[in-house]
């Protein structure tokens, strides 16, 4: 497949030690050769692949020196895109990197679209669609475990499993074709039905195993949606600041200071938390605060974990007890804050209301109890769930939806075969399952979906 030559800045914009401008395509080396001058004056076209060269970029129209650079030359197909690739390392300033990019564009390259380098890797057969999506997961990973899951998917872990499932279905379809081609032989159909049921059952079971990892995989990918809950002025914002280790929320003695929800990502002992500091949930006449309270209720409904904060120096109120009832069926940790003040809270009643849920005492003002809280969060998350590093996790919402559809169609095939439906009719569901699994890795997917997926990538990737 032939494409034009593209170029883009592949590093984040801003000031830094270096920046990289990447070119990919049949003319990448020729374009670079027009603008690159080495001390020895030798052409890049004579250089070996996978080599690095020092020199200057020079505008061929004016002979003006634009930048001092290191240039990496890599010839296809042993590159990310399977095309000729040139990466120009220049100084990391906004003006510098933009001048380098403009020089490449005015000498024959086209500005790359978002995700176009990865899209070319997919279209040229270097990676499949699930591996391409894993590239973005790797970039966005917020913990080591999330990064390891993305690396496993990039390495083809999920692709190989999906390939095995599709191969089993293909073998089943081949057996069905034999039955269709030789309908006069009853024993052929008698052999076909058990094989079909056996292989489809194995495929279904493997799909179910994958889907069982989806909740953990989604958390690793997107973070554990964690709501900080409690009455106003019990220390919710102080807790957010302690976990994030920055002053993201206003901390005052005035109840109701947090009028809106505040979100922040934080890595707590390998657990990615998407922390939401809510406005205190209470009845209020203040219109602005009431909007914040309603948003807090919405956040609560979508939470994976609740950090329920109580005040050690206050008696339990009817509002506290109502909040216990609200979160009764959810995963939560009770945090009794302000232990540096005289005790007024009834600890026995808190234990009774919390039941089996963990209780941690803290004095966030004195920075006490935060370590114990982090340990409690990690213990809750990792308890028998996610320690097995050899699991293949599925976390992408598109993959999960396709797996659910594939499970439904393969179960229809099993039920139909067992009910005595002719195998040529059962074949329809088996084929549809094969197609749905193919959409995960991009074998059976529409071009419009491919374009949409890659448009979500950043420029230069």
Curated annotation (Swiss-Prot):
Binds 1 potassium ion per subunit. K(+) binds at residues 233, 252, 254, 257. The keyword Transport does not apply. It is found in: Cytoplasm. InterPro entries: G_TrmE, GTP-bd, GTP-bd_TrmE_N, GTPase_MnmE, MnmE_dom2, MnmE_helical, P-loop_NTPase, Small_GTP-bd. Its EC number is 3.6.-.-. It is an enzyme of class 3 (hydrolase). One of its GO terms (biological process) is tRNA methylation. (6S)-5-formyl-5,6,7,8-tetrahydrofolate binds at residues 22, 87, 126, 461. GTP binds at residues 233-238, 252-258, 277-280. HAMAP family: GTPase_MnmE. Exhibits a very high intrinsic GTPase hydrolysis rate. Involved in the addition of a carboxymethylaminomethyl (cmnm) group at the wobble position (U34) of certain tRNAs, forming tRNA-cmnm(5)s(2)U34. This is tRNA modification GTPase MnmE. It comes from Lysinibacillus sphaericus (strain C3-41). The gene is mnmE.
């Amino acid at each position: 497949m032939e494409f034009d030559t593209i170029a883009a800045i592949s590093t984040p914009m801003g000031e830094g030690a270096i920046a990289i401008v990447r070119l990919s395509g049949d003319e990448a080396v020729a374009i670079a050769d027009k603008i690159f001058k080495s001390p020895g004056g030798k052409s890049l076209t004579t250089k070996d692949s996978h080599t690095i060269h020092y020199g200057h970029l020079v505008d061929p129209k004016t002979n003006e020196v634009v930048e001092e650079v290191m240039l990496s030359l890599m010839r296809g197909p042993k590159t990310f895109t399977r095309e000729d690739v040139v990466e120009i390392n220049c100084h990391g300033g906004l003006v510098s990197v933009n001048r380098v990019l403009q020089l490449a564009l005015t000498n024959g390259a086209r500005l790359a679209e978002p995700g176009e380098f990865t899209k070319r890797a997919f279209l040229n057969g270097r990676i499949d669609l699930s591996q391409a999506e894993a590239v973005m997961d790797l970039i966005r990973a917020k913990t080591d475990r999330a990064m390891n899951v993305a690396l496993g998917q990039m390495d083809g872990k999920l692709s190989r499993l999906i390939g095995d499932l599709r191969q089993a279905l293909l073998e089943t379809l081949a057996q069905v074709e034999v039955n269709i081609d030789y309908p006069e032989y009853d024993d052929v159909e008698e052999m076909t039905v058990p094989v079909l049921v056996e292989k489809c059952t194995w495929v279904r079971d493997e799909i179910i195993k994958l889907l069982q990892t989806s909740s953990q995989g989604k958390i690793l990918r997107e973070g554990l949606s964690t709501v900080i809950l409690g009455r106003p002025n019990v220390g919710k914002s102080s807790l957010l600041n302690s976990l994030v280790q920055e002053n993201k929320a206003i901390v005052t003695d005035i109840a109701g200071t947090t009028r809106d929800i505040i979100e922040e990502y934080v890595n707590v002992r390998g657990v990615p938390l998407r922390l939401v500091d809510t406005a205190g949930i209470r009845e209020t006449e203040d219109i602005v605060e009431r909007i914040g309270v309603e948003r807090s209720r919405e956040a609560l409904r979508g939470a994976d974990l609740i950090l329920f904060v109580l005040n050690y120096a206050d008696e339990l109120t009817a509002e506290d007890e109502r909040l216990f009832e609200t979160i009764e069926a959810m995963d939560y940790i009770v945090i009794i804050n302000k232990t540096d003040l005289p005790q007024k809270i009834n600890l026995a009643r808190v234990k009774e209301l919390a039941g089996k849920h963990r209780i941690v005492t803290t004095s966030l003002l004195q920075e006490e109890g935060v370590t114990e809280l982090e340990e409690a969060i990690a213990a809750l998350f990792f308890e028998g769930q996610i320690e097995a590093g050899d699991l293949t996790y599925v976390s992408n919402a598109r993959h999960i939806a396709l797996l659910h559809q594939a499970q439904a169609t393969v179960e229809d095939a099993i039920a139909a075969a067992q009910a005595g439906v002719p195998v040529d009719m059962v074949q329809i569901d088996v084929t549809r399952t094969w197609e749905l699994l193919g959409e995960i890795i991009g074998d059976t997917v529409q071009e419009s979906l491919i374009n949409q997926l890659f448009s979500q990538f950043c420029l230069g990737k």
